[in-house]
Amino acid sequence: MFYILLTYLVSPVLYLLLFFRQRDDVKKILIIQTAKIGDLICSTPVFREIKKNYPDASLSAMVNSSTRGLLENNPNTDEIITIKHADYKGLKGKLRLSSLIRRGKYDIGICLNPNIPFALALFWGLVPIRLSVMPDFSGFTF
């Protein structure tokens, strides 16, 4: 809840910065999937379809260190970013994560985890086009 409130407070500044970052062509795409092995296996068709629709774009995947091996030989991923959840806990960790995303200068960010801090990190990381799976806190995800 704290991260949502913080996002509302700084969103005018972030929207202004996003206005200056928008580009017409898509060069870099980030997919965040830091869940378990089964979730990553089920989301590999997403990588294929994105690469099919954006063949010239560089596709990066942000995954756990335990699931990195599943994507190492995947022809649809150009870069694999390995993260540890312990390194990104707390406000400092979330700011470090958004800084990592900002340095990547991604045009599209897709968060496949129903995890609010990762979805907000795309906004804090100044990704112009953001897609995310959001939980509704009643046990269902939409």
What are these regions (language model features)?
Residues M1-F142:
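Catalytic machinery of carbohydrate-active enzymes
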